[in-house]
């Protein structure tokens, strides 16, 4: 699998850039501002979350090219 991978929670406004099997960035909009949270998966639940993101489990879906440009500029 090539990285980065991009996912979102369908209908919830949370967006993810997965850099590799142990790192991801979560982005959401709060009061009109992009809020960014970087996560390094060190514990098992975090590692499982990245696997769920990559496998598109639950409500995780791929982001469109327009969404990627909007939520992860630069």
Located regions from the model:
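Intrinsically disordered, low-complexity regions
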Residues: 12-14, 33
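Low-complexity intrinsically disordered segments
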Residues: 34-74
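Broad, structure-driven detector of short, well-ordered beta-strand segments within folded domains
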Residues: 14-20
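Basic/aromatic-rich interaction segments and small domains that mediate binding to polyanionic partners
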Residues: 24-36
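N-terminal helix-cap/turn-to-beta initiation motif at the start of protein domains
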Residues: 1-5
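Tryptophan-anchored aromatic micro-motifs
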Residues: 6-11
């Amino acid at each position: 699998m090539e990285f980065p991978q991009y996912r979102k929670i369908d209908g919830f406004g949370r967006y993810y850039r997965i850099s590799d099997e142990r790192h991801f960035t979560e982005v959401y909009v709060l009061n009109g501002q992009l809020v960014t949270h970087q996560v390094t998966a060190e514990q098992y639940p975090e590692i499982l979350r990245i696997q769920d993101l990559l496998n598109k489990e639950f409500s995780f879906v791929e982001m469109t090219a327009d969404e990627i440009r909007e939520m992860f500029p630069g």
